[in-house]
Design a protein with these regions (language model features):
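Alpha-helix N-cap/helix-start and coil->helix boundary motif
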Residues: 36, 92, 118, 210, ...
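Primarily ABC-family ATPase nucleotide-binding module
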Residues: 17-28
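ABC transporter nucleotide-binding domain
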Residues: 196-289
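C-terminal coupling/interaction segments
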Residues: 2-15, 292-331
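Residue-level "edge-of-site" marker
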Residues: 154, 283, 317
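ABC transporter nucleotide-binding domains
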Residues: 27-30, 37-218, 222-231, 237
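Residue-level detector of short coil/turn "hinge" positions at structural boundaries
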Residues: 132, 148, 276-277, 311
């Protein structure tokens, strides 16, 4: 069953993405091996090694961290000053054939505003020499919910969100195995963002390799299974955001704990090896700072049993992606 077969879903989700072609090289992996890129004397990307496979991966980092440069290296727009970049087993730089595999949605507004949306997507289909450019164009427009009268208006009349969607349609028209998106949600309203996130999820589930950057951290947290954190041109951390946070042992984790006897529990926790500090909240409960996530989790249960205290809630207070990002940048 595809999403088209689910009653009431097509209007929201659009046509189901085609499975990514397997190809001779298997899954379309992106491999960066000790990659560095200089702009003059400025190091934009510094000795990054990573492998990205099928699914959705988020690039996270402050402005100027090197995210766009990294995407341009993967898309073959820039050559590595050192190291190698391959996509689906092919060298990315100076290789026009790579564009059969890659779809790119750049951050800047790289559209021909005098064309209609349909003409712009169709022109991309023809550049790829697709056998049925008209059908491919219609399918791509439907995937981004632009298969309306708006498709036949000039792009210069579009809102920012509509321009973003038409760029995504052009990137998808040839059904690439790899999709690279730089700040793809800019200008989209909440419904459009929800639809685009659902589309990227479904593409990832169908075996495509999706890499996107976003300055809206909640979207990265909701959308991507894997996060690559880029800080000052370096790969600062890699994994899901909870794993990244737990690996950062140089700073304490903060927990909100509610129990049947907060004072007794607080007194028993003070001085324990895994606990760095305890505060009683005026509204009830404890705020506990712990240096070792796993050790504290085990010790808290043991202490509660010893004191005859019933635990009502134990919640990490600082595991949002915003918190992870703040810690990584600060360090």
């Amino acid at each position: 069953m595809t999403i088209d077969d689910i009653p009431g879903q097509r209007e929201i989700a659009g046509p189901a993405p085609a499975p990514a072609p397997a190809g001779a090289g298997g899954p379309a992996e992106i491999v960066l091996d000790n990659v560095t890129h200089w702009y003059g004397n400025v190091v934009a990307v510094n000795d990054i090694t990573m492998t990205i496979g099928p699914g959705v991966t988020g690039l996270l980092g402050p402005n100027g961290a090197g995210k766009s440069t990294l995407l341009h290296l993967v898309s073959g727009f820039l050559s590595p000053s050192r190291g190698t970049v391959t996509v689906a087993g092919q060298t990315a730089w100076h290789n026009p054939g790579i564009y059969k595999v890659i779809g790119l949605v750049p951050e800047r507004d790289s559209v021909y505003a005098f064309l209609t949306g349909r003409q712009f997507v169709a022109a991309t289909a023809k550049l790829h020499k697709l056998p049925d450019a008209e059908a491919a164009t219609a399918r791509a427009l439907a995937m981004v919910e632009m298969d309306t009268e708006a498709a036949d208006r000039r792009i210069e009349t579009y809102s920012k969100g509509m321009r973003q969607r038409i760029k995504v349609a052009a990137a998808l028209v040839h059904e690439p195995r790899v999709l690279l998106l730089d700040e793809p949600f800019n200008g989209m309203d909440p419904r459009q963002r929800m639809h685009m996130m659902d589309l990227l999820h479904r593409l990832g589930d169908a075996g495509h390799t999706i890499v996107f950057s976003s300055h809206i951290l909640e979207e990265v947290e909701r959308l991507s299974g894997t996060v690559q954190v880029i800080v000052a041109g370096r790969l600062a951390a890699s994994g899901d955001y909870r794993t990244i946070r737990r690996l950062m042992t140089s700073r304490p984790h903060v927990f909100q704990v509610a129990s049947s006897d907060d004072r007794a529990l607080a007194a028993a926790l003070i001085g324990r090896p895994s606990v760095n500090g305890v505060e009683l909240n005026p509204a009830g409960g404890l705020e506990v700072r712990a240096g070792d996530y796993g050790a504290f989790s085990r010790e808290l249960a043991a202490v509660a049993r010893e004191q005859g205290v019933r635990l009502r809630a134990v919640l990490p207070a600082d595991e949002s992606l915003e918190s992870v990002f703040t810690y990584l940048v600060a360090s």
